[in-house]
């Protein structure tokens, strides 16, 4: 009784005073409350063996210390004082601790050495692998365990295990099992009390501390014995722990404990790894362990000998009986443990963490544990770390159950809530949840209330609507009837006027209506309803009206429901019917008259046919009215019966109009046929599993679930659900419910999410759900599409099979299952409280909208039907995704094949639609075609789809039209030629200009569709014939097959030729047309023989093509395609009918293609390649281009045999082909009007002049790809120069000849002259520029009066014969021409004044430019583009800053960023007194206005008084409303300096640099990285550094240097007495008189000194620098007008802030160069205008 247990924690708390004294000696401070928190709660979580009651074991204390001192976010700096104090107590225990401390030495962190026998001293032991060794001296026994006064039990404080009994001597040859059995049997199991007391009473045995469970054991004779692992231990470890890949941390902890407690050998470690790890995991662990091997320098090494020595992969020869062998083993275990830890680090996968959500019935605490475990497994973050508490808290809120998460998000002050608070709140919410019965009852009650309320609202709304309609209809019909009567009576009929004494009720005189005796008395009864059809002017009572007669008609393609009104003269539409006509009618109603407009003519579908009618558009009418005008056209008959009005047609049949969807509108134009599979049909009863109507939703049971692979770099995408209207949500709700009931949609939780898009079906109010899978499609791997091409799918259908069956599979994609791993990809959000759904839904089947769905389904169905095709080889089965066509030769075969196909589909799990089935018919519709008797037609539906499209207004609408019409192009001859005007408008960036040509082409295509012929199906057993024609670059043809004596068209083909082929002569264009159409026809012929018939004999052209027109590549392509005699043959030349492209009965005029092609000439008819006998000149031209010193140089020359006529260097980079063209062109220009023979060795120049130039010109100077050809300007110049000589012969000669002929000598001289010109003569850029452009002819020069005055001053002469002035031997160019030329040159180059001047000086201009330099400077300065980009060279002089007149009145403030220090300080707020230079700096964690005002009010104001002026930059903390409001309230003038001008805050900016430099030096000198600790020393230096006037800020402020003490001075007594207070005051007064006033005067003198102002004035135009420019963005913006100026800054129009003068530059406003001048005249009312220039 009364006994208590003494623990280390309780012991320290009882002696807390001594603990605080020890902590003070360690320079730390501890508190009892926090020590109680850390010891039992924090330190046990470090997993180092710390007990909750504490321990004095130094090994455990050191391990806890290492955890506390860990760098980075996992450290615990707040626990440092407590663990340091605890360590000091353990190292030097006070008297009250010594009795409870074990005398054993603390474990050393070095590698352990197992002793081979008893030793004199205990060896050092590792904290990780403790090896228990006997102590030299036994512990003294305690005489008393239980104290008489109820003292604590002391035995619990020891760290040693209970002592074992004495071990008997063991025989040397005895085995270990028998020894251990003997040992165990000799020692009975003691009770806890006995073992506790025995340790205090009996001394321990010599080897009592040696473990008996290790594989390496110390025997009784001091020898180590080996005990391997038992199979039961390995089995238990394997089965009771998770795998390494599943939970590496837990398995690593197990192996660590095994290595610590069992001391396994190398073989045991391999056995342990092989049992607990897989082969791949083991290899990864061994690899990481070898990476952790360290060399002699302590760093990881990669030397093989050192790695193999420390961590061998093969069995080492270690001797465990020696200390060296045991040290090797200990190191191996340590490396192995490091490898386990490194290999167990899994990469960060936050998606896995996000996937952890709270279960429906899971408690919040259990969910939190799962969430923390996910953080440990999938991230490197520790969820217990305080720094990660925010992330864990947010995950806990977001991933909780929806009801808990929503309420947690609404908590007040959520940021201050800890994780423990959130769990507590979540538990409250979880415990207050309603039971499923209560929730179901609440849902039922709410549903009933909602339905009841909705029903009442609907009834009330319906009553109000009927009442309003009756009232408005009464007014309208009364107005109509009144108008009709007035029309019949010839005018307006007014009510007769009453006399003064006449009754308005009975019309008798003598009384009024209120006193009329005939008027009924009593309460007024309910007013009877008025019949709409019996209204009259006065109104009257009628019988109960019959049901409203209504009828639905189709107006303009839209169904409209009308109210039949025989009294209405005209039919009325209420809604906007589209365009309205200009006609209008005046409608007089009961409430007044109003004018309404008529609609344009609308097509109305009546029972008697389609008519055109115009309606009266009355938006105020409550219902559309069917008046007598349409009833007459309808020939309707109205019969009134007791049951109501009945409307019938002219033949007595009821009038009914079908209302249907827009996409099914085309079915109205088709011949109606009865469905082949009716509800009572035998096809349904015989094959119930094959039809969707009887078999339900299909499921392909033989197809494995599909796995959708993602791209390697794909990450989950989550797109929130778009807002959805209530109408749309209710519209798709039934579809969602149906898919949920069928299991196609299931609830899920997925990181993927894509929105649901409700799409309204046209013409109805029904919606269908469509999922936007665009982002998912981007992240899924692409597969090659194998869906058949409908263009040639029917080519495999032989004409002999004329019995068809068409099946359309219902919900085909939903028949294929999705693998569970791929289902989360297609998740979408859906909320329906009525169904109890609030979350995500995903597809279990293949969804629609997925890009690979058609291909996957097509392949799956094709594989499933493979056996059917093998078993029925006589049948033809065509498949296009989910559309099947079965063809047979007879009706019986078709029926049998259809039965087999339906049975196969049912067995496979697919379902066909009975409504759309076409079984065993000779005419069916398939893929938009009508198939019958081996032919195919365009269905009327396809034609109506194209015909119903309106005229395109945008490129997108035009592309839609061409796409729809292009599907039918096989039926339209010359389709490419018709659509040629339309295709240019579809290009991006082209202006959509719809003109007459486009309208004509649009109507021609529609007209061609209406007359589309029937095309025969391709018969692959017969040869094909292709008739080809070409016209104006368009290839046209028809593919036919023989049917008896006739040719039946199979397809009409047309295509536009490429630009190269379009420029050829007609015969060659025919070759290109045949090649293009033969390639397209191959898609239908499937490689069958093809006979080509054309009006040209092109076979000879293909066999021997002219090399001057065709390139080798194109020639090879044509020959390989057209000379394949096994497949392509040429028929006789035929003349084709341009309408049908079929041969004419009469033969056309024959011609020889080769002969015509040979007669085709180039540009110049007289041009030849043979020398002219009587030529005036024979010249040789050559161009040269070569590399010299890394630069390509070029030149051109024209020579005779012996002399050089012309040679010129060309710009660098000029190609040899261009140089040849320039040389040849120059020769032709110099031979103008003469006979010339010119030789060139360039095949390119020769072919361009003779052949290719004309070809280029014909095809618009474009390549085959449609791009512009190279050397375009040179080719055009050459073609133009060909007409200059009188007679011309361009002759090709071989280059680099060595003979002595005239041709060889001339060619060598031309080549040599061109090379020398390229090397010696600099390129004449200006001359080339002028030659390439249109030259300025002196005959067009016009000189102004100013030009003439200048010319006379220069001494220029006037050339009378040529009409221009000459100066320095050159024609003088007038000033206006000079301006235009230089302005054009500058716009091309945008060079500056100096560069353009140098360029013009270097060139040899043929003209003298008047006022060139002045004009050049003007052009360069007035260029707006250069002004926005070029840098400014203007320099602004330094200004003078305003300073305070005394300390504390004027401060400059700034934030500067410093690298993060301790406790999160990363900013420094600096205050500088501008008068004295005194600096105050405060470390801060944030850069906010709150901190600025706080430091100003708490630090600056109490010490220095209230500032008068504050100067800062435009930072957010200074311009915020908080800072400015505080300054305004305190009367502080807050001056904001110019942006991006640090000189404006120069004093504080310079101080920022000084403080940072000082802190850098101090950190390097002291070795610490805590700059906050060193900040006072930096401020001390800044405050005691002399300023510009030789005084330090401290001296200016206090009048003397700071007191310094020399502690080595022998006379320290003189520092003990300080001056009196009066002396201090006198000194400060002297400072104020001798220092402050002169200093203030000096500052004032600086302000009074004149400062050179900037040159800008109010009204000037300036460019403003853009300080943050993006890529390819000009550096200047503007120009702006200057509004205000200061000596250093400006305010411009359009920018609110002041701008420093250094950030602007003057904008040169180009003055208008007038072409007219104004002069005064003698008459004051007249002025004189003269042409001129300034």
UniProtKB/Swiss-Prot annotation:
A motif (LYPX(n)L motif) lies at residues 128-132. CDD domains: RNase_HI_RT_Bel, RP_RTVL_H_like, RT_ZFREV_like. Residues 1443-1601 form the Integrase catalytic domain. Mg(2+) 2 binds at residues 1182, 1220, 1241, 1311. The record marks 129-130, 214-215, 477-478, 533-534, 658-659, 1329-1330 as: Cleavage. Residues 560-630 form the Peptidase A2 domain. Signal peptide: none annotated. Disulfide bonds: none annotated. One of its GO terms (biological process) is symbiont entry into host cell. Residues 429-434 are annotated as: Interaction with host UBE2I. Residues 433-474, 485-498 have a biased composition (Basic and acidic residues). Mg(2+) 1 binds at residues 808, 882-883. Residues 437-477 form a coiled coil. It holds the Pfam family Gag_p12. It comes from the Viruses. A lipid is attached at residue 2 (N-myristoyl glycine). Residues 1173-1319 form the RNase H type-1 domain. Mg(2+) 3 binds at residues 1454, 1513. This is Gag-Pol polyprotein. It comes from Radiation murine leukemia virus.
